Structure formats: C-alpha cells, structure tokens
Design a protein with these regions (language model features):
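Mid-domain alpha/beta scaffold segments of enzyme catalytic cores
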Residues: 1-272
Length: 272
C-alpha cells in the first residue's frame, strides 16, 4: 500500500510544467501524493493558482501572496487585490512571503514593508503564513514574533537555516517545511545534522518542484530523460524516505505525521 502524502509546496504553475502538467499530476497521484498546495509568488500567479484550483477542486489548493523578490513590483492597490484573493476558499495560506537578503532582488526596506503587511493580512483573514527566510539574520523571526499572537499558524517553507533559527521557530510553535535539500549529502549536511530536532508533529514535507530534485530520486522513466534535473511532486516520497532514515522511523510514520500536520495547519480535507 502506498502511503498518502501532501506536498505543501509545489510550483505547479511553473513554465517547466507547461508541456506535461496533466501527466505530472497523474504521476504524483500514482505515487500517493493526493493533496498539493500550489505555491504562488505574486498577484498574477495567485490569481492563476486560484483559477487552477477552482477548475481542479479535488486535492488542489494554493497560497496567495507576494514573494520578497517581487516586493519592488507591487502597485498602489496591491494589498486590496491580495485581500480579495485571500478570501477565496481555495487559498489556504498567505504567501509565499518573507525576506531574502541573499539576493536582494528587492530593496530590504521594501521587503520588510510588504512582509509586514502580509502578516497583518494573514491575521485579519485567519489564514496561516507560508514563509520564505533566506539570510534574514533574524528579521523574519522578529516580524513573525511581533504578530505571533494574532497569526493562526506559520510554516517556514524550505527550511535551510541554522540550529538557532530552528530552535527559535520551534519554540514559537511554528511548522517547518523540509524539501529535497535534506537528500543532498553534501549541500544538505548541515540540515541533516539538525532536522531531527523537529518533532514529528511540527514536520511538513514539500518538493518545491520543479526545483530541488532529491538526490535519492530514481532516474526519469523512458520518454522523460530530458527532464532528468526537474523535480516533480511524484518524488515527494524520496523526501519522506530520507527523513524516515534520519529519524529512525518507518516511511509511514513520516507520511502520516506530515499528512496530519498539513490537515491541521491548512484546514485540508481528505481528497474525495
């Protein structure tokens, strides 16, 4: 029996899936990934994500938000537009939002303002926050902590931070999203060293597909050799398998815990 899985972060609207999106979904479901949260990073994508979920209501939901890379691009009425999007039942979280001081595609002060506004929106709409934190030097936690009493929930997406970062997030009661980064014995070693600090009842798993293909993934099937570097939601089980090995538990334990956590945080029903 295949364990049922929830991919809480898949960029299913990426152009990399344009030629075979339906087949990607079919492969995911065949692999037990029957619930997917589509990550959206700006207003246009959030609108498209909402439309996709309405057209495909069984097992699909999305986020709505502005990624820190796009903070510089928001217009005067961006928050009003996002507020309307966030009200839709298909939208299960505000985000992807946060801070990225690694690349600074948007000026830090704009990132901070746009992130802060979305935290207020999450509190006002009762939606959890889907958080991006890269090299923020504690600023993401500082803002989250400022709003913490009003936020219904937080997941730190694609966590690759430090031991101290993890301790702070866990002490605050946040969920932690783990991707195929943990499957990389070289780049992911620091994460491997600390990941089991995450209690199973705070663990969420995600592919971040089409990015971060797990290093323990099998070779693509015949006909998909040209996608050998592309990640897919069907490979979420590779993340669960690596985590099960690190925790010293069964694959089913990781699958069940992450499924229940996703249900709790995002108010997800079982698929029909």
């Amino acid at each position: 029996m295949i364990d049922r899985l929830t991919d809480i972060g898949v960029n299913l609207l990426s152009r990399q899936f344009d030629e075979d999106r339906e087949a990607v979904v079919e492969r995911a479901r065949a692999a037990g990934v029957t619930r997917m949260l589509i990550t959206c990073t700006d207003l246009a994508e959030s609108s498209l994500g909402q439309a996709f979920c309405r057209a495909n209501p069984d097992g699909f939901w999305c986020t709505a938000g502005v990624h820190p890379h796009h903070a510089k691009d928001v217009g005067r009425d961006w928050l009003d537009q996002l507020t309307e999007l966030a009200k839709d039942p298909s939208v299960k979280a505000v985000g992807e939002t946060g801070l990225d001081f690694n690349r600074n595609f948007s000026p830090p002060e704009q990132q901070l303002a746009v992130f802060d506004a979305q935290l207020t929106l999450a509190a006002d709409t009762g939606k959890p926050v889907f958080v991006h934190d890269r090299d923020s030097e504690g600023k993401v936690f500082e803002l989250l902590n400022r709003h913490r009493g009003k936020l219904p929930g937080v997941v730190v997406h694609c966590f690759t931070g430090t031991r101290l970062d993890l301790q702070l997030y866990l002490k605050a009661g946040f969920y932690i999203g783990i991707t195929g980064w943990v499957c990389d014995a070289r780049r992911g070693q620091d994460l491997r060293d600390i990941v089991t600090m995450i209690p199973l009842d705070r663990l969420l798993i995600e592919t971040d597909a089409p990015y971060l293909r797990p290093h323990n993934a099998p070779a693509p099937p015949p006909g998909l050799e040209h996608h050998k570097r592309r990640n897919e939601p069907a490979l979420l089980g590779c993340v669960a398998a690596q985590l099960a090995q690190l925790y010293g538990v069964d694959h089913a334990d990781v699958a069940q815990a992450s499924w229940q956590n996703a249900s709790r945080l995002f108010d997800l029903p079982d698929p029909a």
